[in-house]
């Protein structure tokens, strides 16, 4: 059994105004899940994108506007949104404080397709799987 100490995981600059902390991925031994926390400055978050797998977006602190397809919802702490595989989604911070969102993907690596081709599409991918 491996006990993970999440606050020991480094914060990574995802994009300007958005920091990310990995909780579980292939790099940490996960085989079917990628779980990470994002900390977003006011007005910032994740641009519209698509994952090939299901995702759950949970607001831990703050208030987010989450987009799913052509719909949007205001999501507060202890609320989440299930994003179906291949659905376009994104979110932004609606408050003047830091938004904390936890994302869970049904895959051990992060892969996404963005409208903005400058955005990184793959993260937390080990060089070799030790299967």
Positions of PLM-derived features:
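A short, N-terminal "cap"/entry segment at the start of jelly-roll beta-barrel domains
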Residues: 1-33, 113-131
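Conserved short histidine dyad/triad with adjacent acidic residue
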Residues: 36-50
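Tight coil/turn sites that cap or link beta-strands
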Residues: 41-43, 78, 86, 96
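Short beta-strand His + acidic residue motifs that chelate non-heme Fe in jelly-roll/DSBH
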Residues: 48, 66-67, 83, 89-95, ...
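Glycine- and acidic-residue-biased ligand/ion/polar-headgroup-sensing regions
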Residues: 54-55, 59-64
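Short acidic-glycine-tyrosine-enriched beta hairpin
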Residues: 70-86
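A short hydrophobic beta-strand segment most commonly corresponding to one strand
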Residues: 82, 96-114
């Amino acid at each position: 059994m491996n006990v993970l100490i999440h606050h020991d995981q480094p914060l990574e600059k995802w994009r300007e105004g958005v920091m990310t902390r990995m909780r579980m991925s292939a790099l940490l031994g996960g085989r079917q899940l990628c779980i990470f926390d994002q900390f977003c400055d006011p007005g910032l978050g994740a641009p519209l994108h698509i994952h090939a797998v299901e995702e759950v977006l949970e607001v831990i602190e703050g208030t987010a506007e989450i987009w799913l397809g052509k719909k949007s919802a205001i999501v507060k702490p202890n609320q989440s949104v299930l994003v179906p595989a291949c659905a376009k989604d994104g979110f932004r911070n609606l408050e003047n404080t830091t938004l904390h969102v936890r994302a869970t993907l049904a895959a051990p690596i992060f892969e996404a397709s963005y409208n903005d081709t400058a955005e990184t599409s793959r993260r937390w991918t080990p060089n070799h799987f030790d299967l």
